[in-house]
Amino acid sequence: MLAGCAGEEKDLFDKSAAERLNETGKIYTARLQSSEAGWVMEYYPTNSDEEYKGRGYVILADFDKDESVTLAMNNVMSDDVYMEGRSLWEIIADNGPVLTFNTYNEVLHCFSNPEYYESGKGFEGDYEFVMIDVPEDGEFIMLKGKKRGTYVRLTRLPAGTNFEEYLADIKAFHNGIFPASAVNENVLQVGDKKYSINNANSGMLGMYPHGGDAITETTTHPFLITKRDGKYYLRFRSAIEVDDETSEQEFVYDEANDRFIGTTNEANYIEGEDPVHFFYTVFGSDAHRWQWTRTSEMSESQKAALDEVAAGFRALTNLSLRLVGENVVMRVQYRNSRNQNASVDFIFNVTEEADGITLKYDKPVLDAGANVLPANPALATYLETMSQKFTVTAGSSRFNMNTLRLTAASDSNNWIIVTYY
């Protein structure tokens, strides 16, 4: 005779699922409140590549113990001025702990308001977030949009942080390192893959294989700039993946070397284009030029030489290196003895080398150039002194090389800043 299994399986938990969720909610609430100054929220409305729906927005959040929250931002959604909003928040149980902003907050709810975008759906952003990772005393908390599934990272702010000053700081850094007026593309290296990048000022970085086709191969990668421990960080919405084992999502700015380096692998980086190559590529068309004047930054020897050249004219307007026809010329623009604008061109051969540019003076263009030289011997001397090798470095930052510094390879005390036009 077989005995029946009358005993019941022992309950693995002392409390019900609802009770456990409620306790977890209390713990997570306390952890959000534990940051005295609040948190940096890296908010992305959707995973779209559309400019406003897919780009990132830095929102600062201070969760108070009275169940109110102060949110702040300074971006295109606030008309690029500082804006604060105050509302209520709580952590609710919904198949797991969910952070909800349950009364209207103009800082966050504008991303879900259908009136804010011409599609009639708004930016389709979330205002409820599944709490994915909320470690005790953690520097970071990871959330996930309940509807759109975009990941939102919270970073603890140091005590005493002023919201308005913090937002102004990172905005100024972003616009300074990636100005809308930047004249050159930049470079991103992850693993053995190198990419050209552009449009970084918008926060919707365009990326294509270095040397590839910018029109057909560009992909879009939204990112945000934040700051912690006195350093600026650039973090993409999604990691840049080269293969299953090689990726990088976040980079920290290395001020000494003017580049961003990967936080997981310092061999990964973002930096400006090579100054030598950028200087040379301007001569690929006649659309742009490198120009300088007597008021440009320069060494004492350069200033003395240009002062002598200027003394031979009624006024020296500017000098430039540019493509004219099939030749690179140094154009000298001046005011003649009749106070008329005039210019003369002198052909230079330009050679790009790994460590610099070599300029070699050839001859004047047409008789006008030849006729000016006897009347202004200082100009003839200047042409010869510019006929040498120069190292080329960024005037201020490789991320925006609207100015470059040419330094004589044979004399580091002979240099001049030239400007991109």
Protein language model features and the residues they cover:
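C-terminal motif of bacterial Sec signal peptides marking the signal peptidase cleavage site
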Residues: 2-4
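Acidic/polar, low-complexity intrinsically disordered N-terminal segments immediately downstream
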Residues: 6-98, 134-136, 142, 148-150, ...
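Short, hydrophobic/aromatic-rich segments at coil-to-beta transitions
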Residues: 34-42, 66-70, 96-99, 139-142, ...
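Hydrophobic/aromatic beta-strand elements that line small-molecule binding cavities or substrate pockets
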Residues: 57-63, 87-90, 126-133, 221-223, ...
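A short, polar/proline- and glycine-enriched secondary-structure boundary/capping micro-motif
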Residues: 80-85, 109-115, 152-155, 272-273, ...
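Short solvent-exposed strand/turn elements
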Residues: 97-115
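A recognition module on extended beta-rich or small alphabeta surfaces enriched in W/G with H and D/E
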Residues: 117-138
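Preference for solvent-exposed, low-hydrophobicity sequence contexts
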Residues: 157-405, 412-421
